[in-house]
Amino acid sequence: DAPSLGRVIDYCIDHGAAAVCLPAYGGEFYKLSDAERIDVVRLAVNHSNGRIPVIGQANHPSSRIAIDLALQMQDIGVDLISVAVPRVFGLGEDDLLRYFIPLSNALSVPLLIQDFNPGGPTVGPQFAKRLHEECPNFRYLKLEEPMMGSKAAGIIEATAGGVSVLEGWGGMYMLELIPSGICGVMPGVAAFPVLDRAYRLHIDGNIQAAYEVFSRILPFIVYQLQHMLLKNYQ
């Protein structure tokens, strides 16, 4: 539905989003064929026409296919590539480095890695340091887990600021992670204007006001995170 996608992108631009990322988990990428995912990215790049950075999400358990998708998206004109850690199998960090190093080296745009693993461990400071040393265009790590303040700070320290940390999971842990140095939040479109206001209030030192704004959107986030598809029935 190209017209609807265009309206969503316009909404993001009009409300001050820093970038758009698609098709990701919230956009139900797993229901699209690889060709459809490329079409979605092409529509976004063409419609945005340089008005907002576009992040192409190239998730795939096969590194070869992820590289192919990422290169197609790069050729279309995305500003950054995002790839989720393949959590189909129990992979250690050495295995994940073997997955991501060829992918990152194939790209000329920056790489964002998303680690969405509600049932297990996520990558940490040493992984970020090793991959960033090998692949300087690995610039962002999006984590989605509770109580990760020390991990976020550790990643930033281990990479000397070369890798920035983004908070996912709908923005639920945003306020507790701002003091740890996260550079932003990647929520779904519906919640982002309110979260953006709370984020800006907090970084400006208006912590109580940020909490009051955040507390109004938190029930919505909790409801939505019970199941990804619930956002379709709000």
Segments predicted by a language model, with ranges:
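Active-site beta->alpha loop and helix N-cap motifs at the rims of alpha/beta catalytic domains
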Residues: 1-120, 130
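Catalytic alpha/beta core domains of metabolic enzymes, predominantly
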Residues: 105, 117-229
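A mid-to-C-terminal "edge-of-domain" accessory segment
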Residues: 230-234
